[in-house]
Amino acid sequence: IVYLGDTARVPYGAKSHETIVRYTLQTGAILRGFDPKLLVIACNTASAHGLQALQAASACPVLGVIEPGAEAAAALPGPVGVLGTLATVQSGAYEAAIRHRRPDAIIHSVACPLLVGLAAEGWLEDPITEAVCRRYLNQLSFEVKHVVLGCTHYPLLLPSLNRARPGTAWIDSGTVAAQAVESMLRSIGFRTESARGPLRVLLTDASSRLQTVGETFLGEPLGRLEVVEL
C-alpha cells in the first residue's frame, strides 16, 4: 500500500469545489506514478468533489468513500443522519447516493467543521469535544438512529459521540470503503492471499506531531515518512 496524505494543505472541508478537484488531481497524479492496481480516495470531501475528475484521468479503477458509506446507510431502515465537513454536506453527495439506492430515504445532514480539528489535536475524549459533538448531534431529529460518519477523522471521536448520543448506530465510511476495496480487488482478479505487504507513507509536509497523529489513526507504527513535492 502506498499512502499519500496531503498534510500541507488539509483540511479540505472548507475549500471550494474547484480547489478540492485540483488538489485531488494533483495527489492522484503522484500515486499514478506507482502504477497502482486501484486508487482509493480515502477522504469524504475529496470523494464528494474530485472522484469523477480523478476517474477520468486514471487508467486504473478509482474508488471513493461516499458510495460505500451510502450503500451501508441505504440498507438500514428509517431516517439516516450524515455528519460531514461543510464541503461534503454542501455537495449533497451522500443524499444523492443514498436516494439512488432508496428513493424514499429521509436524510438529515449536519456540517461539523470543528470535529476534524479536535480529532487532529488528539482531543478524543475531552469534555469540550463531547460538548461540541452534542451541539452538532442535537441538530438531528430524535428519529434518526443510524448516522454516517462522513469524514474519516470522525471514528476517532466515537467515545465522545457515543456519550453525546447514546444508542446510535454509527456507519464508519472508512471501514465500509475498505470492505469495498477488498471486494473490487477480488472482482478484477488482483486480490492476493499472501501475507500483508509493506506500507509506504508519503506526506506533503511532515513533523513529529503528524507521525503521532497518524499512528493514532492507524493503530500501529508508520515507520519512515517520506515528504513529496506537489
Q: Which residue ranges define each predicted feature?
A:
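Non-catalytic structural scaffold of enzyme domains
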Residues: 1-230
